């Protein structure tokens, strides 16, 4: 039977519960255990698919087409285990399912209440699909004391009693702020956070304390005494240079050993940290550096591009170099010369996005890369803008545009209305709801045998994750090909363009999918490894 680890947070948000969960999962894997990680999100949205990136950050898409929290990206990157739709749930989705049951009469006339109906739905979610797994790590979003989170805290409290003894523990992540004027770390915020947690019936077994310095022995003793935990269970979570050093740091602090002790697992299997050591050797000893410009529209919040940032770092690891990112708001190119911002960079990446704002700036970035022979990587919207630029500048389609921006005489990019999901035909229309109506999840693509992208993958059949509502119009395929822009990848039925590449260019590739979602520190995605290698070559020319 699986053992359950519940990770909660206190004092302030954004302390890194997702990263802590992922790191602990990786440490348990290093000891030979199997893990599954899940995230409970207290907000009322069904999923983050329609939320602003500035509100929520990145939407992480799973193979089975779920739009989920960005923490699931951490889970995948650290453990290598693909996340699924059933690894993330929100209050909105729970309420939606409960109300649907009530309308069907499933509750047989009972009064539907938070306890037991909502809490039971949460418990059912946590316990489902865990056969054959040694540990299930469950992260609860938000901080203790949030009104939205109360049903989730009540549910995990009940689970602590429902499960057999020594099958559930609670880890509480808190902040130990350093007060310069006093010259010391303060434990009172953590004490109050634990007091709040205990008031709803949860006694943490382990405290994971975020800090930028060593926790003195006296402060550990104080936290153990007033928070009712063992002194050895007060774990120091120091800031580190790279997120990929977190597993090693937490192991050195004794987190995984304390978790196994809390479950009564002794003697504990010794961990194999060799692959984490190998990753960090590459991070700490780069043999060069390249600068990549990310030309986007959500550059004010880096979490909007979390998987992209990590995939570029993985590409750097593959080439043993450091990747420096220049963040550029695409709108500036609509009034300023792109050369001022791009002359010094070694590669240009235009990521996914939605809407007309900043689109012309992305088109200008693609033009700069094409004309100056700078490596260009267009992802999703970035591929579409590159095709529009090529249609206008190379194929003579002066009015080329996307129907996403309004009616156009030359719809080089248009709304997808039909596509196949396995054996099922998916149909969408302009008036469809925004939520859950995109082409989502993993789809296969066929690559042209002698194309650059097929050489990069070392294969002609691939599967990648998608999240888009618009597509490049195949009616323009021949005109573009005549001018050196080829559709190197198509859906298996040949109807949907998946990749484009420019023939007369050292590295100019656009993809309709999101390869960043499948990159891992131990297995850098081949497209990012190749893109960074091309940028390295460019750095020797500049």
UniProtKB/Swiss-Prot annotation:
CTP binds at residues 13, 146-148, 186-191, 222. The keyword Repressor does not apply. Mg(2+) binds at residues 71, 139. The keyword rRNA processing does not apply. InterPro entries: Class_I_gatase-like, CTP_synthase, CTP_synthase_N, GATASE, GATase1_CTP_Synthase, P-loop_NTPase. It holds the Pfam family CTP_synth_N. PROSITE patterns: GATASE_TYPE_1. Residues 1-265 are annotated as: Amidoligase domain. It catalyses: UTP + L-glutamine + ATP + H2O = CTP + L-glutamate + ADP + phosphate + 2 H(+); L-glutamine + H2O = L-glutamate + NH4(+); UTP + NH4(+) + ATP = CTP + ADP + phosphate + 2 H(+). GO terms for cellular component: cytosol. L-glutamine binds at residues 54, 353, 381-384, 404, 469. Transmembrane segments: none annotated. UTP binds at residues 13, 186-191, 222. Residues 291-541 form the Glutamine amidotransferase type-1 domain. Catalyzes the ATP-dependent amination of UTP to CTP with either L-glutamine or ammonia as the source of nitrogen. Regulates intracellular CTP levels through interactions with the four ribonucleotide triphosphates. This is CTP synthase. The gene is pyrG.
